[in-house]
C-alpha cells in the first residue's frame, strides 16, 4: 500500500536529514526534506504511536528527536483541542465580517502578491503546502490582506489533504 511505501521511504532516506532540512520549502516538485506522511497521519492510516515506535526501533532518539518532537506536538495539540470543544464550536459558528472582493482575490490567487498567489495555486492543485509556507500564507492572509483567520482556516481545510483543525 502507498502509505507503507511512503513511510518506509522516509524512514530509510529522509529521516536522517529531516532536522537540518525540514524548514525549507523547495517547491511542490521537491519534498524530500519533509516526511510526506501528514495526509496518512491526519486520516489515521498511519498511527503516531506506531510511527514513533517503528522509528525508534531503528534509530536512537538523539538522531531523530526533531521528527519525534513534531509528532508529539501534533498529538499535544489534538488533545488540547479535544479538551476545549468550545474552541471548535466558536470557529464553526463564527461569522466574521470581511471584504468579499478581497476574499475572492485571495482564494483565486489574484492578490498581486506573487508568492501568495503561487501558494494559492499550489494549494488548489497539490492539496498541500509546506509547514512554513502555511505560516507565511496565514501571516499575509491576516496582516496584509486583512482577512479573518477563520476564512483562511476554512480555505485550508477545504483543500489540504492533511488538513487538521488542531495542527493548522
Feature-to-residue mapping (PLM):
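Structured secondary-structure scaffolds
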Residues: 1-165
Amino acid at each position: 500500500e502507498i502509505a507503507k511505501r511512503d513511510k518506509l521511504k522516509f524512514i530509510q532516506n529522509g529521516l536522517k536529514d529531516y532536522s537540518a532540512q525540514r524548514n525549507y520549502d523547495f517547491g511542490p516538485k521537491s519534498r524530500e526534506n519533509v516526511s510526506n506522511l501528514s495526509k496518512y497521519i491526519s486520516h489515521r492510516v498511519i498511527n503516531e504511536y506506531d510511527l514513533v515506535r517503528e522509528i525508534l526501533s531503528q534509530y536512537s532518539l538523539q538522531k531523530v528527536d526533531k521528527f519525534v518532537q513534531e509528532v508529539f506536538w501534533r498529538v499535544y495539540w489534538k488533545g488540547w483541542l479535544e479538551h476545549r470543544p468550545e474552541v471548535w464550536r466558536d470557529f464553526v459558528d463564527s461569522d466574521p465580517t470581511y471584504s468579499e472582493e478581497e476574499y475572492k482575490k485571495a482564494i483565486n490567487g489574484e492578490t498581486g502578491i506573487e508568492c501568495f498567489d503561487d501558494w494559492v495555486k499550489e494549494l488548489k492543485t497539490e492539496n498541500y503546502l509546506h509547514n512554513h509556507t502555511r505560516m507565511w500564507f496565514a501571516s499575509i492572509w491576516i496582516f496584509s490582506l486583512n482577512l479573518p483567520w477563520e476564512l483562511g482556516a476554512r480555505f485550508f481545510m477545504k483543500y489540504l489533504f492533511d488538513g487538521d483543525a488542531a495542527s493548522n
